[in-house]
Amino acid sequence: FIGDIWSGIQG
């Protein structure tokens, strides 16, 4: 989920 909330978790 790049560019979403998960962007920080996903990388």
Curated annotation (Swiss-Prot):
One GO CC term, this protein: extracellular region
Domain of life: Eukaryota
Entry's localization field: Secreted
Sorted UniProt keywords: Secreted
Principal localisation: secreted
The UniProt record lists the keyword S-adenosyl-L-methionine: no
Official protein name in the record: Venom peptide 5
Record organism: Brotheas amazonicus
